[in-house]
């Protein structure tokens, strides 16, 4: 057993796993969190070190995930299942790192590219179901873990000085796109203004509606679960459809 495995086995021991751990290995191709597959003599699990540089508010991030997943489970919807620590918490701070464990969802696949129209259709249906099952959830309970994530006016204000500086000299190569963007500046506040005045309802938003954030059943091809819930926040469902 290598030292790194010894460390990982020690971290896994902080969680209420069923069965003795027999192996831990890197898993997936995500770029944000560091993910491992934990094998036991019983169920399998996903062990993750959360990226606190991108998500410094671990407490509220995990609170968001717990609120949404518990709501989905109460309606019989398959979703990520948080495995508590041995002390009953949803995550653990270990040697300066923020760690959590999910139950591994067996017999599923995910895709980085759409292999056929059926998968594309199922992906759209899956995110539609996600919105539908959470339509009665009070999204004001959720915390904004990444400030101004889909706040277009705020991003536009950031864009203007970056365009003026043009530090890498690339603006000329995309001038038609820039002109198009600038010509629609009067529309950028529509959604945010609607959220503020209540004309657009506040809803749970996933904010990262990529194909590979859906687990499909390996046999039927049907969507089983929406994953990568770290960007769940309050917002407009238009954010997710826009993505």
Residue ranges of predicted features:
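Conserved beta-strand elements flanking the ATP-binding pocket of the protein kinase catalytic core
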Residues: 25, 36, 81-83
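ATP-dependent phospho-/nucleotidyl transfer catalytic cores
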Residues: 18, 25-29, 48-59, 105-121, ...
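Active-site Asp-x-Gly
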Residues: 216-243
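Active-site beta-strand-loop-beta-strand hairpin of nuclease catalytic cores
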Residues: 39-44, 221-222
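Juxta-kinase regulatory segment immediately upstream of eukaryotic protein kinase catalytic domains
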Residues: 1-25
